[in-house]
Amino acid sequence: MKCFGPFLAVSLLAPAAAGSHPHIFVDTAVKVVVSEAGELQAVEITWAYDEFYSLLIFEDRALDSDYDGTLTAEELAQLQGFDMSWVEGYEGDTYLTLDGEALALGAPEHLSTEVADGRITTRHRRALVQPQAADGVVIKAYDPTYYTAYTVNRGLEVTGGCQGSITPPNLDQAYTMVEELLYAMPAEQAEESYPKVGEAFADTLRLSCGA
């Protein structure tokens, strides 16, 4: 789940039932910055929020008073970086691993915030704390609690002569796992603590370099 101010207010409006996850839908693009030497240096993430969540953000910040789905230049300036105020411990819903070991990412750098057709789209960059050989790196975009659903449907770009592939999740297996976990919980616990199943619903991005 995203951990920034407006999200906390919006979450109060969301249905409480555990089975109703996810609540927020984000179309995602990933640009992987790799040097000519094959060293992974950074990732640039694009989040395009669904129309309903965008509307809630507008209302929370008293923007788009004429409800036409577009913002004035002044309103857009107020929105810049709205999703970059992350609480301590929040991973940014972006996870990189190599041979099963996590690769640490630095703090987010806001790149842009735009609004089109009533949807907010933001871009940010995160550098690796320690640059890493890109070959074999796996990237996943997911909220562990599955409150937010990310789909990498806006493209994967890899620079530096490496390539990337996208493998979609096995949704049948993912939903079966959710059902089994929920049925194993007391009803009151399921309502309060949704199982951390987000990774099961994530696209898998894999980098390869060389011939």
Segments from the language model and where they lie:
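Short, functionally important structural connectors and interaction interfaces within domains
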Residues: 4-5, 32, 44, 63
